[in-house]
Amino acid sequence: MQTLIFEDALCAQLSPLAAARPACSLSIGSVTLLERLLPFGQLLTSLRPHLRRYLEQLAGTRAPLWGGPAFAADGISIPAAAARPAETQSRYGSLLLVVNARVVPSRESLLTLRSIVEAGHRGIVRTPSAVAAALLHCSPTHDGPDDRLLQMLLAGTAAADTTELLKAHDLVELDAMVDMLEWPHELVSFHELALAGSLAVRLDSGTYAELRPGLFVAPEAHVADEVVVRQGPVVVEAGAEIGPFVCLDGPLWIGPHTKVNPHAWLRAGSAIGAQCRVGGEIEASVMEPFSNKAHDGFLGHSHVGSWVNIAAGTITSNLKVSYGPIRLPARPGHPAGRVETGRQFLGALIGDLAKTGIHTSIPCGATIGVAATVSGNVPAWVEAFTTTLSDDGGLPSRTTGVQAATGLERMMARRGVELLPADRDLLQLLAENA
């Protein structure tokens, strides 16, 4: 069996969170869609051109900037140890599961996709505006209509092509439904709904020891005796270190090799990715791998990309003074204008490689672009590759791809990760198109 994850035109609308990474590599409820689909067998991707080029250059030499599974030179993900491709291949043979990269990787989505595969009926799952998934039957001789469709999907150069190719193919509509992302703030909403189920899936593996009621710890993790667990589940992955006098409220996930500094308060609904450094107060937020929020400050109802540094004293507002619903700022050149989130609590949406200065204040619903640098009182919208020092009264300045790569190289060195030419080329391309 094979699985193809494809990006459609609306993936770009998830920027800044999905500007420098595939939408299927965004974390929701402690897991990405790509990780959810690894057990389904050999995994292929059809991504936006700049990401396709990046992964081709990377050619499996290292995991991509955003962490997670590595990719081989042909764009096929290298399966994790938890995957069972041989078993899946023998059971489902020539089936091809096609999944939109914007599908929410919840436990419910996983069960729906599994049921589609188990039933084995060739068909398509639609939403009013998109194709969510499809199941195709490939031929043993690789010359059937679904085989030809697969080759066209893999060769596609425009995101819209994939959706149109699937819609035009002769497929029966399947009676199934999965949640899909449309706007970046929905990552916060779906994360809140998915985290408990995601942790339940992890705990079902039986690899965690319950050190005390509600605290589940993987081997080689260290939790100081003085840590307080007020409610569970709190799941701590291998190699993580939690210092003394930390307060933990579940549901909470702490990723592999992440360090939690003494006196931190990690509140319910948070998921801290691999190799992060965290301190202060964090509530109902996602931090993608390799990011820092090591000092006092508050991060609430936010989504933070990879290789982000949140400096000491940085505070995100997550509730309006009026207690009213929060709106996302209007995107330059986008016809939608301001986006009604319907959320009373919403912090910041921070793209990969962004940085804040000390004592930075970030308003509700702020959107901070890839490789942006902010300090002082931050505006609601910050373009990618800009430096916005609002307290000096000046206009934002541009950050070049070379400058962003230099800063990233220094940050990577502290994690023992090498910056590769493919990383530099990706940043240069993103900077040129910012």
PLM segments and residue spans:
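Short coil/turn segments at secondary-structure junctions
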Residues: 18-21, 227, 341
